[in-house]
UniProtKB/Swiss-Prot annotation:
GO molecular function terms noted in the UniProt entry: RNA binding
Source species: Xenopus laevis (African clawed frog)
Stated role: May regulate the stability of some mitochondrial mRNA species.
Protein name: FAST kinase domain-containing protein 1, mitochondrial
Top-rank taxon, per record: Eukaryota
Presence of keyword Cell wall biogenesis/degradation: no
Comment field on protein domains: The RAP domain seems to regulate mitochondrial mRNA levels.
GO biological process, one term: mitochondrial RNA processing
Amino acid sequence: MFRWSCAHRLSRSLCQTRFLSTDPLLDQLKICISEDQVFQLVGKNKARLSVTHVGHAINLLWKFQKEKPRMLRTIDQVRGHPEFIALRILAENKIEFMEDNALVEILYNILRFSVEPHDSLVQQLVMEGWRRLERFNLKEISKFAVCLGEQHMHMSPLMGHIASIVDGILDDVQDARILSSLMVNIHGVITPMLRDRLVDKADSLMDTLDVSHFNHPRRIVQFLRNMKHTYRPLLEKCNNAFLQNIGQMDPENLSIIIGLYQSLQYNNSEFRLMARNRLIEMVDQCNNVASYTKLFAALGPMAGQETREKLEEGILTMVDGMNPNQLLAVLGTMEEMECRNTLLIARIASLLQKYLGIYRPVELARITQAIVNLRCQTPELFSMLQKILERNLKSSFIPGDVAMLARVISSLPAARVDEEVFSKVDAILPQCSLSDLSSLALAIVKWVRTEQPSRYSTSGGLGNLLHKLNTCGHERITKIDKIDLFLEELKYITGDWLEEVLLKDAISTCERLIDQITWKNLPEFALFITRTNYLCAPVLNKIASVATEDITKIHYNATYAILLPFVVLNYEPPNGEAFFDACIQHVLPHLNSLDPHLVVLLAYSLALAEYFPEELIKAVFNIDFLGRLDAQLETFSSTLNLRIRLRLMELNRAVCLECPEFQIPWFHDRYCKQLQHRANAGISSVQRQIHQLLGEILGGINYAKVSVMTPYYHTIDFECILDKNKKPILYLDQNVLSADLSKVQWGNGGQLQETKSLPPGAQRVAIEFLDSKAFSKNSSNIKGEYMMKKRHLEILGYHVLQISSLEWNSMELSTKDAWMDYLRKRIFTDDL
């Protein structure tokens, strides 16, 4: 029996060998080891080439290219070779005989050689693929979608057909590569329902994904970016896959992921730190323009000063060999780095002038914004840019492009525009989104200020244009009936237009759409309300109600955003205690998962509202945590770095003053002295005037001090001391500051008292003048940070008088006598 079995297997093997060797030409193709051998074989056997031979030859040519480093690939030479052209002609003639898999594979590989989408072979393959689409398997559909995406057909009916098929078979998809490829290509034609199904499917597949394939999660993150959908549970799974593969990533992959995270406003400190370290390791290994450009773009904004200088020196030696896209990437990175290397800026500006004519409008806008922010001193570049920008604006019929171009034109130094630009802006206003209108409002206001010499300015035309723009804004915002559209259009509005023109309409729309507020849009909605600086009780009550009810459905990372409007505006909703407790309990179990800077911001925001969860406070003021925070802040921009360090100091001060039982040490003395030194601006004329008024009221200039520094470095506008009979006490030494903690101690009732005490019954009085920033837009309710300062001053032993600048500058207080009477009443009749 065994002998018969062996004989049978041998017979079958011989049959297979004989069958495989019946196509000698295919056998010869399979043993080719270079493009030249393939072309030689094709040239000698054109008449004998079957559809199988053609497909195998094209696939083999791409295989050889793929195995080479990018810098050594010869795509252009292969594409222009006569035998490759012959292969394309043969393929076009044999399309109807191709198997489904072969058809898709040939289309995919032909596109790898940068064959244009309008090429007849590509068009015929696409049309045949469309005809066969319903019978394609999942792998073929996915690869076909990739081919369409590379031809910029994301919004085409054909892609819509693919999305419809995916909707029907999504439950059967079990391959993350197939799913992620489909997601990133059909994003432009899917419904919100299909989007959510795709996200859920990706979320489930990530649990079983081989983490070594980091391109799959990268495409998923790209899909989320394209959909503007920050779904954090899925993002975190993708991020975990990236963390496990950073050692295998090159600058290009790291640059792509960092860019995607920025677009999604997603930050993960562990990834940033590991990515920075990986990129620093590769600095000396990147010795060509392509790789060094990607390294510069990824590492530059995260690098320390020494590394930045090294990167700038390196990029300066390579800049002459850069193509237009690389120059644009470097310029954008320099802007993000706040680069001040004048030699590099000038060289980039000089090279850009050669390519301005080939950049798209959005790229021209990025260039203009960057060179303005970098303070470029190249008048010729500005002049060329203005001409090209105006030409693009006049020829464009896309409202978003017109608005974008108008905004950047107005940012150019001494820009003068002609009436055709104004006419174009006038014509597209009714079609503009709120974001577009905001950009145009900014541009028009700048043109008004520069006194544009045209009939639009001389006859009030620019004023009329601005009036029409405002009318369009009012009409558009009142017609919006979906809160997600409302948030999308207002998300990127910058400048004063929202505050000065649309604010009341925006709040009215919030009230009108209040029933559409859900746990899904709550964080973004809360951030918008914070931006408005408008205290609308019904809207804030709704936010608190939804958050309290559905807090378990909301990602813990969003807790800070939800709390923000309440603590900033100093508003406690009817269910205030339950709301704050729900938020606190929701986030406490996840402190180790939050980025360090977000933990600091969260703790500070709760401190504004007088909430000091011990677990949170102890987590912040921990040596290991502060070390992680320092490491993270090194990767931030200087502006964000300073902001977080300031919040940490303010939190440290609040805990020391309001929760001494926690025994958290004060460790910001040197930091505050540095801040004090940098901010030493002297006394303003208004302060000097009020100081004189106080001197007349109190009996002399030496009875009041100006710009007083307290323990823990609060600055008081004015200070005086009254005895138990409310009589002023003279300051013997005007130059002595009260910032020495060695002179104070804790007294009864939780107040700090000076060890060298005041006379019995005496009281320090702090007089604080609050400008408009201390109040919400629509009420006299004092905002959270100013109420915190008042609490702290009272703990330090002060009686605090907070005087509104609006009240001080009112018609009722328009004379010196009125000011003095007002101050006298506040100082001597307020209960001390």
